[in-house]
């Protein structure tokens, strides 16, 4: 198997996973701090999706730390295929959650001008949480792309 930048068991892979954890946790934190987020199904789905992404990325970051400390090779076909499936599933869930939440934010901000009339409505927090979820998705997309190419090189 090829050693690609950002693959499992590499320093760049660990940094990608830490970035995914950090941006997913930040997205959850900002969304939970917003008032009345639980009224909207898309925002609840965003929190659930980012929570799953946080757990998945944290688990793989721990595995990367284990591999780096013990000089273990994580690039065998069975492990990499598990990484590919997990990354692609969480990537699709995260993209769907980010897009649906962005749709709700655009609806409130631009279409019905709800954010302008309701000054206590936390639209800025919703926007920041959605932006962070897209940052998370970009990092997941990079990870899933790299692991897919590692699996394809077998």
Curated annotation (Swiss-Prot):
Family matches, as InterPro entries: CASP_dom, CASPL-5
GO cellular component: plasma membrane
Topology of the protein relative to the lipid bilayer: Multi-pass membrane protein
Record's keyword terms, sorted: Cell membrane, Membrane, Transmembrane, Transmembrane helix
Cytoplasmic side: 1-10, 64-77, 151-154
Domain of life: Eukaryota
Transmembrane segments: 11-31, 43-63, 78-98, 130-150
Subcellular location as annotated: Cell membrane
Family affiliation: Belongs to the Casparian strip membrane proteins (CASP) family.
Subunit structure: Homodimer and heterodimers.
Name of protein: CASP-like protein 5B2
Organism the protein comes from: Arabidopsis thaliana (Mouse-ear cress)
